[in-house]
Regions:
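Charged, low-complexity interaction tracts
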Residues: 30-149
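N-terminal, Lys/Arg- and Ser/Thr-rich interaction peptides
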Residues: 1-6
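Non-globular disordered terminal and juxtamembrane segments underlying protein topogenesis/assembly
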Residues: 7-27, 60, 129
Length: 149
């Protein structure tokens, strides 16, 4: 694997780990469901794909993968027990992050915004990116030097 790919993969993995923390804080710790058992599949549905190299460009993708979760209508897992609404995996992040919930379960923490994405973007700063880049370079066996000019 080209060394620059190792660096990009390392950075993406750090973003994925930080996202796990943000979902824990902003989604799961905000309340405990009483109508279903939490699977934590939503937290694990965010993927850092392996990077690719094209010419002199390395790129990677961090994304939500709704198909990695299971839908169980009987248990209201990742969707509704109401057949008219059904499987919500495709837009579950939007529902959770915007506090968009139907009237079936009344008011509660699930009707409040629990936006882990906004938290992730706010939490990652330039220092994190620089630190992760340096760590990724070290993991790839590359030396970073500053040329002051």
């Amino acid at each position: 694997m080209p060394r620059l790919q190792i660096v990009v993969d390392y950075i993406l993995e750090q973003i994925r780990k930080r996202n796990v923390d943000e979902i824990e804080t902003n989604v799961y710790r905000r309340g405990t469901p009483s109508e279903y058992n939490r699977t934590r599949q939503f937290q694990q549905a965010w993927k850092a794909d392996k990077s690719t190299i094209s010419g002199n460009t390395a790129s990677g993708k961090f994304h939500y993968d709704p198909d990695s979760m299971e839908y169980d209508a009987d248990e209201a897992q990742h969707g509704s027990t109401n057949p008219a609404w059904g499987d919500a995996r495709e837009y579950l992040a939007e529902l959770i992050y915007n506090g968009a919930s139907g009237p079936k379960y009344g008011d509660g923490y699930w009707t409040q915004r629990r936006d882990a994405w906004e938290g992730l973007i706010r939490d990652i700063d330039g220092e994190d990116i620089v630190k992760w880049t340096r760590q990724g370079f070290a993991q790839a066996g590359l030396t970073v030097t500053k040329n002051r000019g």
